[in-house]
Amino acid sequence: MLVLSRKINEAIQIGADIEVKVIAVEGDQVKLGIDAPKHIDIHRKEIYLTIQEENNRAAALSSDVISALSSQKK
């Protein structure tokens, strides 16, 4: 893991298209501004993990439904 120190209004560049800028520091909270192309999904990690869990659950359900339908067809 790369660890960088930045002050307010300083940024890091990720590739050619993504900039992460420190907007504010208030107590133990850091506000970041992220400038990225619209096709790049940006989520808080806990939201991203929830999305992944839901996608996995939906995929498992889909395979169960397909199995049930194919067994009824026989």
UniProtKB/Swiss-Prot annotation:
- InterPro entries annotated for this entry? CsrA (IPR003751), CsrA_sf (IPR036107)
Mutating residue 25 to G leads to what result? In sow-20; suppresses the motility loss and flagellar assembly defect of an fliW deletion
The question of whether Glycoprotein is a record keyword is answered with no
Look up the record and give one Gene Ontology term from the biological process aspect.
negative regulation of translational initiation
Q: What causes induction of this gene?
A: Part of the SigD-controlled yvyF-csrA operon and the SigA-controlled fliW-csrA operon. Expressed from the SigA operon at low levels during log phase, with a 5-fold increase as the culture transitions to stationary phase, peaking 1 hour later.
- Entry note about domains: Contacts FliW via its C-terminus (residues 49-58).
Its annotated function is as follows:
A translational regulator that binds mRNA to regulate translation initiation and/or mRNA stability. Usually binds in the 5'-UTR at or near the Shine-Dalgarno sequence preventing ribosome-binding, thus repressing translation. Represses expression of flagellin (hag) in a post-transcriptional fashion. Specifically binds to 2 sites in the 5'-UTR of hag mRNA in a cooperative fashion; the second site overlaps the Shine-Dalgarno sequence and prevents 30S ribosomal subunit binding. Mutation of either binding site abolishes CsrA regulation of hag expression.
Q: What is this protein called?
A: Translational regulator CsrA
The encoding gene is csrA
